[in-house]
Amino acid sequence: MLQTSLTLPAPAKLNLFLHITGRRPDGYHNLQTVFQLLDFGDELTFTPNQSGEITITPAIEGVPLEQNLVYKAANILRSHVNRPELGATIHLTKRLPMGGGIGGGSSDAATTLVGLNYLWQTGVSPTTLAQLGRQLGADVPVFVEGNSAWAEGIGEQLIALDLPQYWYVVLTPACHVSTVEIFSHKDLTRDTLAITVAAFFEKGGKNDCQPLVERLFPQVRDAVDWLNKFGPAKLTGTGASVFAAFPSKDAAQKVFANKPKHLNGFVAQGVNESPLHQRLPEQCITGV
């Protein structure tokens, strides 16, 4: 018997650095990055049924249902288990900006895969769920696996990391940065030398997309310049969001309270285990 409903988090992420080490024959780029999960994000409420219909509320303006990552995630899981009668109503409470570089759509898709696998009782293993997620986007597997992680390849080769749990100020300028546009731009740095995990912990790293994004989007540059007054500011992903780390919640909130009014954002703590995995029963995570 299907559970009536369940509300689950879809946490944000930050890229603590992002090195582009080469371009592959298939057009994708080889990357090195660290995904830092946060204790803030979207929420999804799932109500499973046997109608064969996937309903998403509210509709996202300008995004057809078939292109909605939540819908695509539900559909790909249902197709994988060949259970066309499975359905669900999914209500998305959106807190993360689209096109912000903080993983909103990818995290929503991952929460949908993990949550519906549990509610539909389809018994798909976490490894297979991550593989299904990869078909939806390179960032989806880290949210399925549920740990802050070192990533290589196109971002799908993951090693869980134990990161310092800093507090972060995350600011999002009023612009949309296209990942496709940035990764296809002729001026993007694509030849950064690979580093080791130990080198990251010793010296950190940069975001190879940041100089280009700042040049193309003055709003991002201005946000970086403002946040740099309080700590080293970095772009996450291809933007548009930028962030800086602080040692305490109080320190982060003091900076955030003085942000320019035109910048949206939030304060959140870095976590090593996803809030999604903290919320779910153990058997949902292990596949037992």
Curated annotation (Swiss-Prot):
Alphabetized SUPFAM superfamilies for the sequence: GHMP Kinase, C-terminal domain, Ribosomal protein S5 domain 2-like
Key words, A-Z: ATP-binding, Isoprene biosynthesis, Kinase, Nucleotide-binding, Transferase
Annotated ATP binding sites: 97-107
Residues at the active site: 13, 139
Tree of life domain: Bacteria
Record-level GO BP terms: isopentenyl diphosphate biosynthetic process, methylerythritol 4-phosphate pathway; terpenoid biosynthetic process
UniProt entry tagged with the keyword ATP-binding: yes
Pathway given in the UniProt record: Isoprenoid biosynthesis; isopentenyl diphosphate biosynthesis via DXP pathway; isopentenyl diphosphate from 1-deoxy-D-xylulose 5-phosphate: step 3/6
Catalytic function, reaction form: 4-CDP-2-C-methyl-D-erythritol + ATP = 4-CDP-2-C-methyl-D-erythritol 2-phosphate + ADP + H(+)
Documented EC number(s): 2.7.1.148
Example GO molecular function: 4-(cytidine 5'-diphospho)-2-C-methyl-D-erythritol kinase activity
Database matches in InterPro entries: GHMP_kinase_C_dom (IPR013750), GHMP_kinase_C_sf (IPR036554), GHMP_kinase_N_dom (IPR006204), IspE (IPR004424), Ribosomal_Su5_D2-typ_SF (IPR020568), Ribsml_uS5_D2-typ_fold_subgr (IPR014721)
Role: Catalyzes the phosphorylation of the position 2 hydroxy group of 4-diphosphocytidyl-2C-methyl-D-erythritol.
Family: Belongs to the GHMP kinase family. IspE subfamily.
Name used for this protein in its record: 4-diphosphocytidyl-2-C-methyl-D-erythritol kinase
Taxonomic path: Bacteria, Pseudomonadati, Pseudomonadota, Gammaproteobacteria, Cellvibrionales
